Every structure is written in structure tokens, then in C-alpha cells.
Amino acid sequence: MLELARQLHQDAAEKGDSSFFALRPSLGIDFICWDAEDCGTPSFDAHGENHESTWCLGSQYWSGKHHVDGYTARYGINLDMVGNANSIFFRETISMLYAPSVVDKVWAAAHRIGYGKFFSYEDGGAVTDDHVQVNRSGIPCIDVIATDTNSGGFPATWHTMNDNMKYISKETLKAVGQTMLEVMWTEQ
């Protein structure tokens, strides 16, 4: 997110303008860092049910109380675990239910600029993630999330001591970042 914001600012500065919004006054971009996404009751908890209300606390709060009265957004793109080497992003099920046109827009952008190997048109599974809360607030939102092609779950290093910078791929981050910039610059 920081690099995307830097790129937007740099592009505006190169054009002699200090504000991205002056270049594209109809387009506002919110960068949001969610918190407490993974704090939920595990599905294997023997002491009770898997309470959905215990997950994605940051996006629950934001979705229930927008930062500005009358806030609206055309759509959202939630980026989660988008830096692993050899990542492939499938069309996540909840994204396809609530925001198929946004999925199509992002995947088409990736393929148009040469990053199709990262964005598969195959359908993936459903993931309880921050985009669920945003969709429930009435804003179509998708989840770009890496899943392991062998297991159908998350990468093997997820939530382990090996979940560290060693496994972050510059190539994958570039593919996702360039795709997001393409989506932003071509938005009407």
C-alpha cells in the first residue's frame, strides 16, 4: 500500500501537481490497514461455535462507522497475503457473489499488462476476510488473496515461525502493485 501511495504521489509530482486528486478529481482512493482480522474463534474450538462476529474486527468497526458522514465508495479491493513467491490468485467465492464486475476488472487489468500467470480465471474457495464486512456495508469489495494450489488452503508458512520476509517475492509484489496501478489509472 505504501508503494502504491508513493507511485500516485510521484506521478502527480512529475506532472507538476501536488495532488493526485487534482489529476483525477472524480476518483478518491482510501488506503485502509485492517486489524484483528485473524482473532476469531477457531472452527475447531470445542467450547463453542465458530462465531463470525469474532473475526475481522477492524473491518467490522470501519464498515459500521464510516470516517466521514455520507461516505460512499464505488468498490473496494482487499489485498491479503499478496507477496508469496509463486502466488496464484483465484477468483474468491464471496468476491464473485458480491462484486463479480470488480473481480473481472482487476483480473482483466492483470492479464492486459502481462501478469495473467498470477491472476487465474479459475474459481477459488470462500474466505472469511475483511471484504465480507465491506460488502455487508453496501460497498462491493473483492479479496485478492493467495491460496496454496496444492492444498487449497493458505501458504505453508502462514501463521508459522517461517512466516517472514524470506518468503516475500518482489516479482509477486510487482505483479499485484502494477495491476492495482493499472486499475486505478484506467478507472473512469
Where are these regions (language model features)?
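Acidic/histidine-rich catalytic neighborhood of metal-dependent amide-processing enzymes
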Residues: 2-98
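Active-site-adjacent substrate-binding region
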Residues: 75, 82-188
